[in-house]
């Protein structure tokens, strides 16, 4: 049994190295949420499914690969309401539940919740970095 767990751990580590390398080679700037997975697993009662996802290891790999390549990794504060903010109009939806997988706003925006959050994380990273870009062309 221990041999199986070791093999799985090596496969996971290999996968995380390959994916972080792919991202570091493809982008000059990467924006991620600064998540505390241990706290999330306790607070949200998500248990092992969240705790066992290797997010910390992935971000460590991505951090050193971006640094070695002279590229920038921007961490967005975990309290930034990326999922609750409409990526079209900026309105914050306070009553968004974890079970709501589709984000719907009064402005008419309707999209996958994670896609909406990703757009907001990208915009916040651009704001933090002070870059002046045509955001709509870069995100769309």
Enumerate the language-model features and the residues they cover.
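Positively charged, helix-rich recognition surfaces that bind polyanionic ligands
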Residues: 1-140
């Amino acid at each position: 049994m221990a041999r199986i767990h070791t093999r799985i751990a090596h496969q996971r580590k290999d996968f995380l190295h390959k994916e972080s390398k792919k991202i570091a080679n493809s982008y000059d700037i990467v924006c991620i949420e600064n998540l505390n997975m241990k706290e999330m697993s306790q607070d949200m009662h998500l248990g092992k499914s969240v705790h066992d996802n290797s997010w910390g290891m992935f971000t460590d790999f991505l951090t050193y690969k971006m640094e070695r390549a002279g590229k920038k990794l921007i961490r967005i504060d975990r309290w930034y309401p990326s999922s609750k903010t409409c990526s079209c109009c900026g309105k914050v939806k306070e009553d968004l539940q974890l079970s709501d997988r589709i984000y719907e706003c009064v402005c008419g925006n309707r999209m996958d919740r994670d896609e909406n959050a990703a757009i907001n994380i990208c915009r916040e990273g651009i704001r933090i970095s002070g870059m002046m870009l045509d955001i709509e062309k870069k995100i769309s």
